[in-house]
Amino acid sequence: MRRAAGSTSRFAAGLIAGTSRRGVAVGHGYARFDNDVLALTPRGAPRMPNGIETDVVLTVGEQLLIGDGQFCTASAILIAGPPWEARPSPRVALTIRPDANLAFDQLSGWGPGLTPLGDDILVGYTAAAALAGAPPTPAASWGDRTTALSRTLLALAALGELPEPAHRLLEDGNPQPLLRFGSTSGKGIIVGLAAAPASTATVCDGRFTVALSLPDGPQTFEVFLSEVEC
């Protein structure tokens, strides 16, 4: 019997509505369909721009089918649930000190993990450019040099779409959910967001620190929060 998933990102809804495709579960709640990676997150967990909320748990290597209006796993057939908007509406601008001076072309694929730290920084930087209406970053080129998951997230960041904890920072000025997101993923996204050219903003009304190990060695940044001018 088919059942509706929880909230569903634009990306996931597109996969479900699209042409039928076979895929495989790759672990940690991710399913790969060619170069597209879908995230399955339980209700209450941070939502992902490539995600769908569901209590379905995948087994590594499990064969999957998506498209023609449904997502078929070994244990369930899901249809898209209510839409979740993965593109935040920023009310907070970020600036960073000292200047990050990051060699962006060297960050793609740098670091361990499903989403290497370098890619997390690029996701934040790419999304910040998209949200500010700035010239686009070479996200597609960066994505060609890293994991399929990072490639998917970079493509979505180019549309301004980000994991839910980033919404809390950009919309509410609350950095804590993003600081707690993943081992270093959230911190990397913060540095990328703050390293992008800042929107016009009022005076600073908050700050916090982010410590990361970067290609040049450990660095500690201070991130300043300001209300975006309307």
Language-model regions: role of each:
Residues M1-L122, A129-P136, A140, D144-H167, ...:
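Phosphate/adenylate-binding glycine loop and adjacent helical scaffold
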Residues T126-L131, A195-S199:
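Short glycine/serine- and small hydrophobic-enriched flexible loop segments
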Residues K187, A194-V203:
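Helix-coil modules at protein/domain termini and other flexible surface or pore-lining loops
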